[in-house]
Curated annotation (Swiss-Prot):
Keywords for the protein's UniProt record, in alphabetical order: Nitrogen fixation, Transcription, Transcription regulation
SMART domains: P-II
Protein name from the UniProt record: Nitrogen fixation nifHD region glnB-like protein 2
Gene that this sequence comes from: glnBII
Taxonomic path: Archaea, Methanobacteriati, Methanobacteriota, Methanomada group, Methanococci
An annotated GO cellular component: cytosol
Keyword Lipid biosynthesis: no
GO molecular function, one term: ATP binding
Organism of provenance: Methanococcus maripaludis (strain DSM 14266 / JCM 13030 / NBRC 101832 / S2 / LL)
InterPro entries associated with the record: N-reg_PII (IPR002187), N-reg_PII-like_a/b (IPR011322), N-reg_PII/ATP_PRibTrfase_C (IPR015867), N-reg_PII_CS (IPR017918)
Amino acid sequence: MKEIIAIIRPSKMAQTKTVLEGLGFPAMTANRVLGRGKQKAIVGELGFEVDNKELLNQPGDMRYIPKTMLTLIVPDEDASLVVEAIMKVNKSGQYGDGKIFVCPIEDIITVRTSERGEAAI
């Protein structure tokens, strides 16, 4: 099993979710996060409400900007399909398109049923 963590533009969340659901991957966690890459932050790119003072009062000229972090667990054989789908929706060729991390998962346990492994996805 693989954990896929995608940091994307908030404005791409709905489309990404729709595509993943259409491929049979409706289970995911989405978090609002602040971050930046190597480039200077694109301060005008706001996909959800954030206090401008929070952005403008940061020291230095490298500001954190809002992003959405999606996390989902998929069987090993589906990881490439999910990564490609996320890339297709989110790749514009511009700074700020995001990052995708693919990590191994040792086990999953559903608390309610005690199911383990892929049955718990």
